[in-house]
A protein has these predicted regions:
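Accessory, solvent-exposed terminal regions and/or long lumenal/extracellular loops of proteins
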Residues: 480-482, 491-577
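Acidic/histidine-rich, surface-exposed loop or edge segments in extracytoplasmic proteins
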Residues: 21-33, 95-97, 168, 390-396
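Hard-cation-handling environments
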Residues: 254-432, 436-437
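Feature captures C-terminal
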Residues: 362-499, 503-522
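Bacterial Sec-dependent N-terminal signal peptides
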Residues: 1-24
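Active-site/substrate-binding loop(s) of hydrolase catalytic cores
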Residues: 86-99, 104-258, 265-268
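Soluble metallo-hydrolase cores and metallopeptidase-like ectodomains found primarily
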Residues: 39-93
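Second-shell loop/turn segments in exported
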Residues: 28-35, 99-103, 170-174, 223-227, ...
Length: 577
């Protein structure tokens, strides 16, 4: 009986393998010139789910396009329960494709990779599980044309960068204006990836490299994980890719005519996929193929890089696990967190850059000099990459944050990100550190539906504040500590304050009629000699103020008991003892 069961199992696996070998992709059918439509992508993955026990297709959250995200789970034993996967000591690699559907290389490379896995043409180790989003920006994928990305070499047709709200989803991970981003956050916390990959295509200079790599900034990732990323993980990928026939180069973050002079490493703040992943102590990578290379070369390079990531993760599974576990524990007890970094141009690493000589020639459009790269003049040169970003500013960790329940949009995002918090059970007075926004700058041009606040200056003071039943108490003893710091501290680059979630405090809601307040102000000054002294001193030191009656009246109002306390008071409070 046992022999019969084994024979049946072998026959079942053989049938699956033969069947999967017969599944070709639109990319292959077109000989590397086409990428599938959204519906072809989903139908293809459904067939893989049906024909292989290694592949499970899950339906996840809804997007702005009216279609749900899907998640493909690939494992040798067919397990798609992520709690079990973690208990069984397996590393999880989350691969995101089609965030910019005009850059579909990862869509096709992932299909080829998984088809080869189930056909036993490429074997993944038992200690690795792949979680793949087949296409993230569904709205952009549906908006298909041959005319977008005029300077990209294939495929024949592809999707659009913006989603159904015309948002760039690779700027939406913190602010989460889209349903797409919210569905992604659910996937991210479901999978809890050890390694995250977000497949892209680059723009910018012309050079010989097919694949460039944007690695999450190692100083920002920080600690032993950052050191391991910089000294072990990333160099191993470069070595592996060279063995596979591809010379990697850091993402070419240069938009002049001489990239051979070097460039600063791309700064991936938390608005970006890789920066968001770093907040959760995940090794994050953004492969960027070169737009001018033929499509089939770009897909093959993406395939090879995903193989390299899988192979390193499998080989170094225990080291990755240990580093992440140690980091998660240390972040719970850390006493301060960085909120800004600055580029150090005195430090760099050297890489071999394979470029083309650039020059100027008359433009046939304007007649003026224009840049061009001469592919008949390739060169190789060792160049500097400025990849050190030391901490510029840090904040001491509070015992907890408290957010009044009225700021429910922020509360929703914290809950979405699995932040641990409790609602106050009764009205209570708590001594807290409160911030007042002293100054800030707002961008004049809109950026992804927002006018970003920056250069924020604050004044902190200890106050007793009355909180109501239902306000939210957020303890700072959790894995989410870094996420909380970089979203709730107003001076952080991608804080919720920066993204305008608290802009209502920046405008006064009450005022006065000058003629009516004049007599009230005069009486108030008679009874408040300290304020009268301050007013007189201001007149002596500020000539324009001394000549402006309205400004002086407003000075009295702003320093009186009638001035609204909510104006410029940041509504996220810090419990400090």
């Amino acid at each position: 009986m046992r022999k019969i069961l084994i024979l049946l199992l072998v026959l079942f696996i053989s049938v699956q393998t033969i069947s999967s070998q017969n599944i070709t992709t639109p990319f292959e059918q077109s000989k590397g010139t086409q990428t599938p439509t959204y519906f072809e992508i989903i139908d293809w993955w459904k067939k893989m789910d049906e024909q292989s026990g290694k592949v499970i297709m899950l339906t996840m959250g809804m997007t702005d396009a009216g279609y749900p995200l899907h998640l493909i789970v690939v494992s040798n034993n067919g397990d798609h329960n992520f709690d079990n996967i973690r208990k069984n000591n397996k590393r999880i690699i989350l691969i995101n494709n089609g965030i910019h559907p005009g850059e579909p290389d990862g869509i096709d490379a992932s299909m080829l990779l998984v088809r080869d896995i189930v056909a036993n043409k490429y074997k993944i180790a038992d200690n690795v599980v792949l979680a793949i989003i087949p296409v993230y920006n569904i709205g952009g994928c549906l908006n298909r044309s041959a005319n977008y990305r005029v300077d990209q070499n294939g495929p024949e047709e592809f999707g659009f960068r913006g989603n159904s709200q015309n948002l760039d989803l690779n700027r939406d991970f913190i602010k989460s204006d889209s349903k797409d981003a919210r569905a992604f956050v659910e996937i991210f916390h479901l999978t809890g990836p050890d390694v995250f990959v977000d497949n892209h295509v680059s723009n910018g200079a012309d050079y010989q490299h097919v694949m460039t790599l944007l690695t999450t900034q190692h100083n920002k990732l920080g600690g032993e994980m950052g050191e391991y990323l910089d000294k072990e993980f990333e160099p191993a990928l470069y070595s592996s890719m060279k063995q596979k026939g591809f010379d990697l180069i850091p993402y070419v973050n240069h938009f002049g005519d001489k990239p051979e002079n070097g460039w600063p490493e791309y700064w991936d703040s938390p608005r970006y996929a890789s920066g968001y992943a770093a907040l959760w102590h995940t090794f994050a990578f953004v492969p960027e193929t070169h737009m001018l290379k033929p499509y089939d070369q770009r897909v093959k390079a993406t395939y090879a890089l995903m193989q390299s990531l899988i192979e390193f993760t499998a080989k170094n599974s225990e080291a990755i696990k240990k580093l992440r576990e140690q980091t998660k524990q240390s972040v719970k007890t850390a006493t301060e967190f960085p909120i800004s970094w600055s580029l150090d141009r005195s430090r760099s690493k050297e890489v071999l850059y394979k470029g083309y000589e650039s020059s100027r020639k008359p433009s046939e459009v304007s007649g003026l000099p224009r840049l061009y790269y001469d592919r008949s003049k390739p060169f190789e040169k060792t160049i500097p990459i400025f990849n050190y970003f030391p901490v510029k500013a840090s904040v001491k960790k509070p015992v907890a944050y408290i957010i009044p329940q009225g700021w429910w949009k922020v509360i929703e995002l914290l809950k979405l990100n699995k932040v641990q918090m409790t609602a106050l059970k009764k009205d209570t007075v708590i001594e807290v550190e409160a911030y007042k926004i002293e100054d800030y700058k707002t961008s004049l041009r809109q950026y992804e539906m927002h006018h970003l606040n920056s250069e924020v200056k604050i004044a902190a003071s200890v106050q007793k504040v009355t909180f109501r039943k239902g306000d939210w108490y957020i303890p700072m003893n959790q894995v989410a500590n870094r996420f909380l710091t970089e979203t709730l501290e107003p001076q952080a680059e991608d804080s919720y304050f920066a993204w305008n979630y608290f802009d209502a405090i920046l405008g006064q809601k009450e005022g006065y009629s000058a003629y009516a307040f004049e007599d009230i102000a005069a009486d108030y000054l008679k009874n408040n000699t300290d304020l009268k002294t301050k007013l007189e001193q201001r007149r002596l030191t500020d000539t324009a103020f001394a000549k402006d009656g309205r400004a002086q009246l407003n000075f009295v109002y702003q320093h009186s008991l009638w001035f609204e306390p909510a104006y410029m008071r940041y509504p996220v409070y810090r419990v400090i003892k």
